[in-house]
Amino acid sequence: MPLEKSLLEADIGALVKSTLSVESDSVNIYQEIAFESLVKDTIRLANGLQLSKVNEQYVCGDILLSDKQVELLAKKNVSRGISISELSQIWQDKVVYFVFASNVSLKDQNIIYDAMYEWESACNILFRVGQGSGDYIEIIIGNGSYSNLGRIGGKQTLSLFIAGWNKGTVMHELGHALGMLHEHQHPMRDNYIIVNERNIQIPARDQFDIWPYGYASSKFDFDSIMMYGSYAYSRNNQPTMTKKDGTTWTANRSYITFNDQLVVMNLYGHYLPPGPIG
C-alpha cells in the first residue's frame, strides 16, 4: 500500500521532529513515547492488542513490557480478563528504590524528587535512593519518555525525553512504574469517549487500543494523571479523542486525582504518611 507507507514515513518524521503533543498553548504536555526516533516492528496479539518491538524490547507507547508480561497477555482473552496484580508486580514493602544515571543533573533531580513527593503525599508509597535488594529503577535522560510497567525484577529503566519533559511527565511515568495503565485505554472508555482513529499518527495508534484487563478501578477518570488529552498524537491538528458530546479536554499533568489514589491503594494497601525522599 504505497499511500499507507508514505503516511507512515511522514508520521514517523512528525514524531521525531515534534516533542510537544498539541494540547494547549498554556500547558506543556510532552510526548510520552518510548524510543522516539527509532522505527518499531508492529506485533498484533491474538486477542487484538497491538504492541511494538524495538530490538528485543516490547513496547506499548511509553510502556515497556517484559517477555513474561507479553506471554501473560497473549494467553489471556477478553472474556477471561486479567488482574493488574497478575500483570505487574508491586514493589515490596511499598518502597520503590531508584538511582540516577550520570546524565541527570542536580536541577533535574530536584524536579524528579518533587514528582515523587506528589505520589508519596497522595498514596502509600515511599521512594528511596539505592538498589534495595536488587530491584530498582535507573532514571535516565534518554530517547523518549517511558517506563516499565510495575516492578519487573532487577534493574529497570525510567527515561525522560532529552528533547523535553517536566514534572508532570515524571508523575505520569512513575504511575506506570507503580503498575498503572493509561486511563484512555480503560475497558469502559467507549462509554465516555470517541476515538478518532483517522486523526492519530500511525506509529502511535497502539496507544489508543483498549486494554480489556489489568485495571484496578472500574471508574473512568478524565482528570487522571494517566489520561491523555484530546489532541494527543494528532496528525492533522484535529482531536484524536472527544467526549461523547464532541467536546475536548486537556490532559492533567499537575496533580494526582482521588481515583488515581484509589488505584494505587488497591494495588499497595493502606495509606502511609510521606517521609523524606532519599
Predicted regions and their residues:
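Zinc-dependent metalloendopeptidases
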Residues: 1-278
